Amino acid sequence: MERTPNPNRQAVELNRTSLYLGLLLVAVLGILFSSYFFN
């Protein structure tokens, strides 16, 4: 039972990191586009 959670934990961590990176990238793009349009 100790062997199965290890790959699952790694997959969850990879999914979380990719999700956070995607949100950060979207936020940066939103700030850039908002500043571009408002200026």
From Swiss-Prot:
Compartment(s) where it occurs, according to its Swiss-Prot or TrEMBL record:
Cellular thylakoid membrane
- BP terms from Gene Ontology: photosynthesis
Keywords, ordered alphabetically: Membrane, Photosynthesis, Photosystem II, Reaction center, Thylakoid, Transmembrane, Transmembrane helix
Presence of keyword Cell inner membrane: no
Similarity comment text for this entry: Belongs to the PsbL family.
Its subunit composition reads: PSII is composed of 1 copy each of membrane proteins PsbA, PsbB, PsbC, PsbD, PsbE, PsbF, PsbH, PsbI, PsbJ, PsbK, PsbL, PsbM, PsbT, PsbX, PsbY, PsbZ, Psb30/Ycf12, peripheral proteins PsbO, CyanoQ (PsbQ), PsbU, PsbV and a large number of cofactors. It forms dimeric complexes.
Name this protein carries in UniProt: Photosystem II reaction center protein L
Which organism is the protein's source? Microcystis aeruginosa (strain NIES-843 / IAM M-2473)
Gene coding for it: psbL
